[in-house]
């Protein structure tokens, strides 16, 4: 029996939690230390109905040094998880900027994921010293809509809050991609 594969590529700035997201999901354990990724992949078998699927998870480096290497993982991707940290407004702006250039550099279905640590007072206090504040959920949802993403999900790799939801949504998005939006052709006669 041939098992169908769903390819899921995770992208976003360095140190926003991409690797933690994948390790926590695949092992049910939060990694104890930060190790910058160059490229890594994981595979898990998931059952959808009575059918087994291999969910291929491709972790990419977020550092600018790897901007030219990262696209090598994009071909045949079924779904992209685009990540930013709610405690890093710069990572949020980078996602918004990359999609506002007219066309997204990522083909296919996008699912915007915001690994949530906390928006608590200590985080707000730290960011306010830099004249910043945590990214609000409403802003994430708006950006996801503006970029044409199928969903915006906030989760925590540390506590596993909504972590499974992220990958369930990715699987659904890959198996049932949204219909492409029809371009309206308008004719204006003056």
UniProtKB/Swiss-Prot annotation:
One of its GO terms (biological process) is small GTPase-mediated signal transduction. A motif (Effector region) lies at residues 34-42. One of its GO terms (cellular component) is plasma membrane. Keywords: Cell cycle, Cell division, Cell membrane, GTP-binding, Lipoprotein, Membrane, Methylation, Nucleotide-binding, Prenylation. InterPro entries: P-loop_NTPase, Small_GTP-bd, Small_GTPase, Small_GTPase_Rho. The modification Cysteine methyl ester is found at residue 187. GTP binds at residues 12-19, 59-63, 117-120. It is found in: Cell membrane. Residues 188-190 form a propeptide. It is a lipid-anchor. Disulfide bonds: none annotated. Pfam families: Ras. GO terms for molecular function: GTP binding; GTPase activity. A lipid is attached at residue 187 (S-geranylgeranyl cysteine). NCBIfam families: small_GTP. Belongs to the small GTPase superfamily. Rho family. CDC42 subfamily. This is Cell division control protein 42 homolog. The lineage of its organism: Eukaryota, Fungi, Dikarya, Ascomycota, Pezizomycotina. The gene is CDC42.
């Amino acid at each position: 029996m041939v098992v169908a594969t769903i390819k899921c590529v995770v992208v976003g700035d360095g140190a926003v939690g991409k690797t933690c997201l994948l390790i926590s999901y695949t092992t049910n354990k939060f990694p104890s230390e930060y190790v910058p990724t160059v490229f890594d992949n994981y595979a898990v078998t998931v059952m959808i109905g009575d059918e087994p699927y291999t969910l291929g998870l491709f972790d990419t480096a977020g550092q600018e040094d790897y901007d030219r290497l990262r696209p090598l993982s994009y071909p045949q991707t079924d779904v992209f998880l685009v990540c930013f940290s709610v405690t890093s407004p710069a990572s949020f702006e980078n996602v918004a900027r990359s999609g506002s250039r007219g066309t997204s550099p990522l083909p296919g279905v996008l699912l915007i994921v915001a690994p949530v640590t906390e928006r608590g007072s200590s985080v707000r206090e730290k960011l306010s010293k830099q004249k910043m504040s945590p990214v609000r959920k409403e802003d994430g949802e708006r950006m996801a809509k503006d970029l044409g993403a199928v969903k915006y999900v906030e989760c925590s790799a540390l506590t596993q809050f909504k972590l499974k939801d992220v990958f369930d949504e990715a699987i659904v998005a890959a198996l049932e991609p949204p219909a492409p939006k029809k371009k309206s052709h308008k004719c204006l006669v003056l």
